[in-house]
């Protein structure tokens, strides 16, 4: 993936769209198509270099749902990298989103950054895990890369997000995952979907990020899903040439400059 190594890399993270074959279908009382459409003006205004889809793109894994999401994101006019969530069918999803971890971790170089997408899903399960083979492939991709910094994306949270309703469905082998992460000091950011609310934490020199949903979000730190009246959102990231990570959220009526951001060096 081409990018000017002297400029920051602007990424728009879109997650947990839960679109169904029926465009009028409701998800937790919200219209998934309509709420994603509401975010498009803010997405265009952010002017990203690429879009990163972090799973649960579809609610029913239907071809029609992936078609509509792909059509909407095509209006942003940049490449789309995508990984599946527990609601997705990878075989169906990759027909519209070919750039993803469909045959093992997917690595793309953009400027000084290596972006690695990993599939944490297990067929028929809500929780996730990584096979040893996938983790070894991840090691190999980092060894083969001359990038200065690394971002890793997955669907399931590798750390608790303090929301019991979703923490029971987390990544089941986080210890193995972080063992491989800790082998390479170039890893600066790990980001995921699944949790349906904003999350930020720092672990050593790595920023850990949970993304909100484009359809319905929960108030954080709740025992059960509790609809957040703030509405749908997506995450923006700016990955600096110095390894810094700036990030914040975009909502339907908010501009990137108007959002609170975090930075790690």
Which role fits each region the language model picked out?
Residues 1-68, 161:
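N-terminal active-site segment of His-dependent metallophosphoesterases
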Residues 180, 202-265:
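Binuclear metal-dependent phosphoesterase catalytic core
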Residues 13-15, 50-56, 80-86, 119, ...:
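Active-site neighborhood of phospho(di)ester-bond hydrolases with catalytic His/Asp-centered motifs
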Residues 12-34, 59, 90-102, 123-132, ...:
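Acidic/histidine-rich helix-loop elements
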Residues 64-79, 169-178, 205-214, 263-265:
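Short, electropositive alpha-helical surface patch
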